[in-house]
Structure formats: C-alpha cells, structure tokens
Amino acid sequence: MLISTAAVLAVVLLLQLVVSPLLNRRVYTDDLVDGSGYPTFDVGMSALAGLYMPLGDYYGSYAEHSGFMRDTLHLTFYDRTGSNRFNIQTQTGLSLGHVGQLNSGDLHAIGYMYSGFFYDNRNPGRNDVWSGDTGQAALDALPEYMRLTSAVSFHKVLTVDELADIMARHPDVDFLSANVWVDGAYNYDSLHCSLQHMMLAYGDDLEEDYPGMQLQEYKNLTGEDITQHFRAMVQYLADHPEVAKAGPDEPYRYKEMLLNLEEDGLEVLGLWVQGTPDQITALLDEELVRSVGNYDARIQLWT
C-alpha cells in the first residue's frame, strides 16, 4: 500500500513539476525559442487580434502558475477607440499544453466577435448616418475637435484593390480594419484584416518568415499589400494550431482559408475608420460608400 501511494505521489509530482511545465512551455514562453527570434505565443495573439479585433491590438502578456498543472495567462489588449484608458485586461488558462479560448466578453469593446455591423452590407452599425443631405448635416453638426470611430458600409462587396484606392484618396483618415471574407472561415461577420501595423515590433526574423505580417509600412497600401498581410496572419495560425485554438475558428479552418484565398481572393464587406467629422464626411463622397455608422465619438486632445 505504501509503495502504491508513493508511486502515485511520484507520478503526480512528475506531472506537476516536469511534464506540465514542459508542455506549457511549448505554447507559452517569455524566451525566444528555436532561434526563431520572436515569441511564438505573442505573435499568435497579434495575429488573432489582426483578424478578429478590428478596434484593438495585442499589447503583451505574462504567465502565472495558478494550480495543479495549470498556468494563468494574463493578456493585455490595446483599445484604439480610447474607451478603456488603461487598456483591456483578460485571462485564459494553459494546462498540459492546451490554451483556453479568449474571453469574448472582456474583449467586446475592441470588436471581438462583433456581429451585425456589415451583415449583407445592410447594417453599418448603430447611429446610422446615411449618405445624403440628412447624413451630411448630422456629421457637419459635430465639432472638429471630436474624433469619430465609424463603420463604413458599401453598395457592393469590394475587391482589395478598390479598398486600396479609397484609402489612397483619404490619407488623413485612419483606416483601422476591413471586414473581410474568404471561404473557410466559420463566421464572415467577425473576420477582419487589420490595416494598422502591429503594436508590438517582432523584428526582421518574423518579417522574413511571414512577409507583410507586421504591416510595418501601413500607409499607401496596395491591394496586394492587404492580401499579403491577411495571408501572413492566417498562415501563422495555420502553422501554430496550439495558439490558434485560443481564437474563434478551429485551427484547420486557417488552412482552408489559405487555399480559398489563392483561388478566390479576399472580399471586403465593410470598413472601420477613425477621423474628424470632416474627414469621415469626405468618405460619403465615394461612389462605393453607402453609409457611415458612428460607433464612438471622443474629444481629440491633440492636433
């Protein structure tokens, strides 16, 4: 009996002190591993933010041992709308090399798992401002010291080249993210492609392995630049299913997205932007723009 008890305790200690840490370190580590030059988990979180969090970005993490064979990952996300002054904090678990899913409630403020804003290009968001005299007057009534976060809806599904043309004609507008679609994704309503550079700089090694992923030059983008940025983020998650499991799509779907991206290209369903009332109003002059929905308005403290 004593031998059996000792054997059980030995197995438990082996799991707790050796096996679990080794498996968890395959998913999360603060150190650079395999000479890759970038932290695998953090890059994966940045990719998930770029694909599913149109109003925010990933800002960092740390791990804390929290129980038997379990670590808690403390994650920070940046809120581009300014609603959360001290950024957004959330947690997920890591046990025996399996990471838990992200908390959609904590991340809702930055657009994680949003639905309905661009459904069938009919619903651009709340507080709709339609193109035309009424919408123009509503935007004109806002003072120029306001900074708007707005959802832009189109008359039709756009190509990435058409999106790039609109961006080129409005250099003063901050284009945050495009609501996009490629076959293979589970829910087209929540899939996006960020149009801003990643908050964390991962260096040349990541750029060499996944060209365009960091979107270091995010001004004057071409349609191919946007497609390559999307391709790189999806490819990274396809290559790292252990991190991709934290997101809303099953890891195998990223491989399907890549195949369909090459065959059919990337479709643009809507757009998230920031700017002054005049800058947002100018978008209504675009022939392809159907409407603008003001999601958030804040006083701009800089010029």
Walk through the language-model features, giving the residues of each.
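Active-site-adjacent structural elements in enzyme catalytic domains
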Residues: 266, 277-278
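Short, exposed beta-strand-loop hairpins at the edges of beta-sheets
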Residues: 280-291
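Short beta-strands and strand-coil junctions in structured, solvent-facing domains, enriched
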Residues: 159, 279-280
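Loop-rich non-cytosolic ectodomains and luminal regions
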Residues: 16, 20-272, 290-303
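Hydrophobic membrane-insertion alpha-helices, especially the h-region
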Residues: 2-18
